[in-house]
């Protein structure tokens, strides 16, 4: 039976993950085994449960308990379900709950890149992409367009932040992902060394004098290719581009010279995922 608890005290510590903890506090880098992430909406929560993530607690609009989210409760065992009316929950969290439900999950242990990429042939590498909406959209494209893994550098947005998870529609739970290096100083040199040691050629998505078209036949023939995408404003750093085996451009019309990184990722995954 669901363990349903009516909210009577906004300051109760068990509500901290939903109301007061920052993203860094939720992540808990000092004690990663205690880290938490928040999933939002029944569909996203279902995908997290399907992937084996362990629920810690739920925050749910009262009418959802016997409504669209009832199926989720049956899958969450005795995890506490904190509930109130929609207006009260919005006051508590500071935002309108998508589909009236949030779930706090235990963060998974980080997986080594070497393990993630053991049998991978096409991976996405994200450098310094800090917009959670873009990160979520990139993961959704990576899942849909057959990327084997997504690798982030240490300055990238956490793929398990609430908005990235929501925008990805839970596909962040379906695509293996990991981090290249421990600190920003490890990128690009150490990160590129890891990719090379795993047999990957690297393709920087950037405009330069040596850029080849995304439909260049040599790219499709590469047995293992890492597609490197850069930050929203300035794109990839010059030393990252210089470290890559290829610099790749997307042919465009009407004088347009670039796309939003999430849109560019979808084009790149579609074209460069072909073998």
Per-segment meaning from a language model:
Residues 103, 141-145, 159-173, 238-275:
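Structured adenosyl-cofactor binding patch, chiefly the S-adenosyl-L-methionine
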Residues 4-11, 80-85, 176-187:
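Short acidic-hydrophobic, aromatic-tinged amphipathic segments that line or gate anion-handling sites
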Residues 75-94:
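A glycine-rich helix N-cap at a beta->alpha junction
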Residues 67-78, 240:
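Short, aromatic/basic amphipathic alpha-helical patches
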